[in-house]
């Protein structure tokens, strides 16, 4: 049985376009094989921005922590445990002001940890999370794929690659604010991409 971690970053929760697409993908995946799904709504999780105080707890022994320090350490430790036990990561990724949502950046700051998910070596960083697959469902009001304005794709490939995850797949749902006809066509194309992905996921 595969463990599937679903991370939704839309401000609209389950009503967001990217969240709807991750839901459709997981539903279809459940029909093809036995999976265990762990779902995280990053908007309601309400992670604070990473602070120096929280980062300091990562190098502390749990027995030496105060209650407040233990609570800060738990942010990263719990998210890391979810990521490490997952086989497949499914991400609902809207675009806000040409970049990723701040809630997803807060998640990245907790899981991209030197000494845990990657290490620095004389030959450069070495990731520790090989063998996982990522599917990113990128919903956008305009059309950015393949242009300099698409900052998400290279950044997310870079940060997952840092952790050793190189099988990163993007499904684009673009032009959603460019008229009903264009949006419908984009949805159709995205759903067709789902059926193509499923055989490779099983």
From Swiss-Prot:
Its cofactor is FMN. It comes from Pseudoalteromonas atlantica (strain T6c / ATCC BAA-1087). Belongs to the azoreductase type 1 family. One of its GO terms (molecular function) is FMN binding. Quinone reductase that provides resistance to thiol-specific stress caused by electrophilic quinones. Also exhibits azoreductase activity. Catalyzes the reductive cleavage of the azo bond in aromatic azo compounds to the corresponding amines. FMN binds at residues 10, 95-98. Homodimer. Coiled coil: none annotated. InterPro entries: Flavodoxin_fold, Flavoprotein-like_sf, FMN-dep_NADH:Q_OxRdtase_AzoR1, NADH:quinone_OxRdtase_FMN_depd. It catalyses: 2 a quinone + NADH + H(+) = 2 a 1,4-benzosemiquinone + NAD(+); N,N-dimethyl-1,4-phenylenediamine + anthranilate + 2 NAD(+) = 2-(4-dimethylaminophenyl)diazenylbenzoate + 2 NADH + 2 H(+). Keywords: Flavoprotein, FMN, NAD, Oxidoreductase. The keyword Flavoprotein applies. Binds 1 FMN per subunit. Its EC number is 1.6.5.-, 1.7.1.17. This is FMN-dependent NADH:quinone oxidoreductase.
